[in-house]
Design a protein with these regions (language model features):
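Basic, helix-initiating cap at the start of DNA-binding domains
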Residues: 2-35
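Alpha-helical structural segments
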Residues: 22-30, 48, 65-84, 94, ...
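Helix-turn-helix
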Residues: 31-65
Length: 190
């Protein structure tokens, strides 16, 4: 998205490219909320985004590349919001609270991009990203099965609670319960 401005000798962000990307992404999310990824036609997406097919293909290889890009952005945003939590030593209570809040803040995008059979992919990618962060902070993390299991328990359990119990319990009580369970699991594991 950065283009060389030869007249001024500097770099500038081409606002038209950014606006086109936003229009395509918005149209994609609207269509994706109504149908599976495999059913979305580029023709329909372009009509909704008010762009030509050639414009779409100048930005993305195909519909899957667009979906992957949006998934990657969402995962990165969630991981960035959780990275403020000190992950080593694994503070399961704080991690669980922040993860749940990040899931809630991104609920619409999570439910659209990772619907149906893609739900497991989402939780696994979050876990993988956290595992990589923890290993960078402490290389011994990768070879510690107890901490790895504890991380899996926190991420997968938190996501399960988010997807299956968010409507049954108010957010504060659910987050408090998850934090209590995570704290107890940490005591058992360590």
């Amino acid at each position: 998205d950065i283009r060389q401005n030869t007249e001024r000798g500097g770099l500038f962000l081409d606002i038209r490219i950014e606006k086109t990307d936003r229009a395509i992404e918005k149209a994609f999310l609207e269509l994706r909320s109504k149908m599976p990824l495999e059913k979305i036609k580029i023709k329909d997406l372009c009509a909704l985004a008010c762009v030509n097919k050639s414009t779409f293909y100048a930005h993305y290889e195909d519909i899957y590349a667009l979906s992957n890009r949006l998934e990657d952005k969402l995962i990165a945003d969630i991981l960035a919001s959780v990275s403020a939590v000190e992950l080593y030593p694994v503070r399961t209570e704080a991690l669980t609270r922040e993860l749940f809040r990040a899931f809630v803040q991104n609920k619409t995008a999570v439910n659209i991009l990772f619907a149906d059979s893609r739900q497991g992919i989402f939780a696994n990618r979050i876990e993988k990203g956290l595992r990589e962060s923890l290993t960078v902070q402490d290389p011994t993390f990768a070879n510690d099965p107890k901490r790895g299991i504890l991380l899996s328990f926190c991420v997968q359990g938190c996501f399960y609670a988010f997807t299956n119990n968010s409507s049954r319990m108010d957010e504060k009580h659910l987050v408090d319960l998850l934090a209590e369970i995570a704290r107890a699991a940490q005591k058992v594991m360590m």
